[in-house]
Every structure is written in structure tokens, then in C-alpha cells.
Amino acid sequence: MSGGLDFACVGVRAEPYAVGPTLVFRVRITANGDDRRVHAIALRCQLRVQPAERRYSDAEAEGLGDLFGERERWGRSLNPMQFAHVSVVVPGFDGSTEVDLPVPCSYDTDIAATRYFEALTDGEVPLLLLFSGTAFRGPGGFQVEPVPWNKEALCRMPVAVWREMIDQHFPGCGWLRLPREVLTALRGYRSRHGLPSWEATVEQLLTHAEADADPAPRLLTTEGSPA
């Protein structure tokens, strides 16, 4: 008689050979009941960030202001965030097995989860893995069982793992997604000013913006009134 399945996340690593940024979660699956033979599982997994499950330094809190507001609001604003939704076919096993769950990631800083990861300087990212799908079990044939949504596993991913993954694909760099017309305008500005790189282009724009934001001091006459 079958007794359901249990799931646990036993590790997470950056995949060095992936075409794009990819995390690999190692998941242990245990079959319960008298008959522990599983022919296959069509498994789905939703990953959520649980921001309320860790502490934050002042520097991290400042970086998270655009997501959660001021610290005074965090009692209401630190809500779970969707990170990814992936699927995998688990081969047959008897009793228990471990499988890799590859999760492609984005470095798009307009995505809330990416901005959250980038704001963290140390420690761990609290994640919740929620499983669903279909399991095929039975000694003499296939018995189809759903994997209910209440099957979940906690994972505390080191921030260093995220940074390692990003550095493998974007070493020492950040990434911004801009509308095509903005890129066209930037390209024209770079060309008109003969700038050697995009970095030099942005730095010059920032320098000019800061200069415009700081008005030149006004000279005073000997009587103390503006010249």
C-alpha cells in the first residue's frame, strides 16, 4: 500500500557548464508505505523567496527599499515572492532517490527576485520549494497518484552561491534592460561624443547630471548680498 512521497532539499549549487545562469537544487525524494517502488514522477516545482525568514543589515535594508519600503513597513510588506517554476521527470527508484532540479535564472534587475538577491551582502536566501505533479507507482502495474501542493521543502541558499552563478556569466558586471529607443539615444550620444565604451558613456552622463544638480555657489558682495 502506498503512503505518499516526502521531499527535502539537500543542497544547491551554481551550474558551471550551463549556457545561461542556472542554479541546481539537489532534492531527495522518499517513498512511504508498504510498497516503496516508484516507476516515475512527472514533477513540478514552484520556488518562492521567503524574505521574512532572515535578518537584514542597514546596507541591505537600504538596497531593499524599492521592494519593501522603509523598515517600519516590513511587518506588512515582506511577502513571499515568486522566483521560478520548473518541471522535471524523475526516473524510477525504490525507497528513495536524489535528483537535480535545474533552475534557469535571470540577471534582469527589473525582476523583483533578482533585485532582492542583488541587495543581499551575506548570509542565506530563504527559499520554499512547493511540489506537485503525478507519481506512477505499484508492484504489478501503474498506480497513478497526484503529488499534492502541500508537499514542500525549505532551502537556505547561501548568497555566495547566487554570486558565484552570476560571476560565471557576468564577471564583475551588472545588467540593465532598457527600451530600444533609449538604447538608440545612448548609442547616438556615445557616437557624437566619441566615447570608447558604454561604461564611459554612462559615467559622462552621470557626471553631467551631478554637475547640473549642484548649482554653482553665488558670490556675495562686501555688504553680504548676492553679486
Model-predicted segments: where are they?
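Short aromatic-acidic-glycine turn motif
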Residues: 47-59
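Extended, solvent-exposed segments with strong compositional bias
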Residues: 63-119
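Short beta-strand elements
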Residues: 62-72, 136-175
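Internal, hydrophobic beta-strand segments that form the core of beta-sheet-rich folds
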Residues: 44-50, 98-150
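Short, basic amphipathic alpha-helical segments that act as recognition/interaction helices
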Residues: 196-217
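Contiguous beta-strand segments within globular domains
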Residues: 16-29, 38-47, 103-107
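Low-complexity, acidic Ser/Thr/Pro/Gly-rich terminal tails and inter-domain linkers that flank the onset
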Residues: 1-24
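Surface-exposed, Lys/Arg-rich phosphate-binding patches that contact polyanionic backbones
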Residues: 180-197
